[in-house]
From Swiss-Prot:
One of its GO terms (cellular component) is cytosolic large ribosomal subunit. The keyword tRNA-binding does not apply. Keywords: Ribonucleoprotein, Ribosomal protein. It comes from the Bacteria. InterPro entries: Ribosomal_bL35, Ribosomal_bL35-like, Ribosomal_bL35_CS, Ribosomal_bL35_sf. Residues 1-22, 30-49 are annotated as: Disordered. Transmembrane segments: none annotated. The gene is rpmI. This is Large ribosomal subunit protein bL35.
Length: 59
């Protein structure tokens, strides 16, 4: 089954079956954000349950 190239670049499937994603708001207009905010945004997030099926079909 073919996968969407855009989704392939943005999401990764973990061994436990969750989908990893990057946080938004990380690069543009970063100087006014606090250090704590930028540090938390650096970490990987997971796709929410409501979006899981839709994104799972793309990858």
């Amino acid at each position: 089954m073919k996968v969407k190239s855009a989704a392939k670049k943005r999401f990764k499937l973990t061994k436990s079956g969750q989908i990893k994603r990057k946080h938004a708001y990380t690069s543009h207009l970063a100087p006014h954000k606090t250090t704590k905010q930028k540090r938390h945004l650096r970490k990987q997030g997971t796709v929410s349950a409501s979006d899981f099926k839709r994104i799972g079909n793309l990858i």
